[in-house]
Regions:
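Structural WD40 beta-propeller signal
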Residues: 2, 42-44, 101, 178
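Hydrophobic beta-strand positions that form the internal "hydrophobic ladder"
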Residues: 8, 45-48, 104-107, 182-186
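Asp-box/WD-like beta-propeller blade repeats and closely related beta-sheet repeat scaffolds
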Residues: 13-57, 63-97
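Structural motif
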Residues: 14-19, 53-57, 116-123, 146-148, ...
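Short loop/turn segments that connect beta-strands within beta-propeller blades
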Residues: 21-25, 61-64, 153-157, 202-206
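Surface loop/turn motifs at the tips and blade-to-blade linkers of beta-strand repeat domains
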Residues: 30-34, 89, 163-167, 212-213
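Predominantly five- to eight-bladed beta-propeller fold
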Residues: 69-99, 106-164
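Extended hydrophobic/aromatic segments used for targeting, binding, or gating
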Residues: 185-213
């Protein structure tokens, strides 16, 4: 359910996403694809964000229209979802890599470029017929994905990229909107894990103000 308690959604067995207005029980069906994933309602329940083919989208529930917020998603570029190393080591096996602003106007998200990460192949023995799985897996000491923090604003084109000192940061380990919605607090970590920096990133410009180390 949305944080304002006005709407909720669920996924049907056929893969459709149904949004329900809790006061009236009126329902709407998201005109999407079964592969759409990682849905999250905006705080004011007016929008439903999701990931489609590694791109971040938002559906205006009232207007019934979807907006594609990123346009470079691919097998090696992930927007709004996490690469394996971030999923496993940084965000505690959480899949979603995006966050609504409190005023529901913008989404901060992670963009992961895995093109330089070695692809590993392993066998999945869980199905009745075993299958091969290919996964971008950075072994210790090898290249990690290049991760950027972007800010997409509903109804506007393009993405504002966060600027936090040397670009790109070796790791972006936390991102959280300030209550005013004008800035995102971002924590960056170096690969040696001995320097953690806190930045406040301006929503409009992407400029990062260094707060502390």
């Amino acid at each position: 359910a949305s944080s304002d308690g006005k709407r909720a959604f669920w996924r049907s067995g056929s893969g459709r996403v149904i949004v329900v207005d809790l006061p009236t029980y009126e329902t709407r069906v998201l005109p999407g694809a079964p592969a759409d994933t990682l849905f999250r309602l905006s705080p004011d329940s007016s929008q439903l964000a999701f990931v489609r083919d590694h791109d971040l989208w938002s559906w205006d529930i009232g207007a019934g229209k979807a907006q594609r917020l990123t346009k470079d998603g691919s097998d090696t570029i992930k927007n709004g979802t996490l690469s394996w190393v971030y999923w496993e080591e940084v965000f505690g096996r959480q899949d979603i890599g995006y966050w609504w602003s409190p005023d529901s106007k913008s989404i901060a998200f992670l963009r992961s470029d895995e093109s330089m990460v070695t692809e590993m192949t392993y066998m999945d023995f869980r199905p009745e017929v075993p299958r091969l799985i290919k996964q971008r897996y950075p072994k210790a000491g090898t290249t990690n994905p290049v991760v950027l923090l972007g800010i997409a604003t509903i109804g506007e084109k393009g993405v504002t990229w966060a600027k936090t000192g040397e670009e790109p940061a070796e790791y972006i380990v936390r991102a959280k909107w300030l209550p005013t919605s004008d800035r995102v607090s971002v924590q960056t970590l170096n690969r040696n894990h001995d320097r953690l920096d806190l930045w406040f990133v301006d929503r409009a410009t992407g400029e990062g103000a260094h707060v502390l180390t």
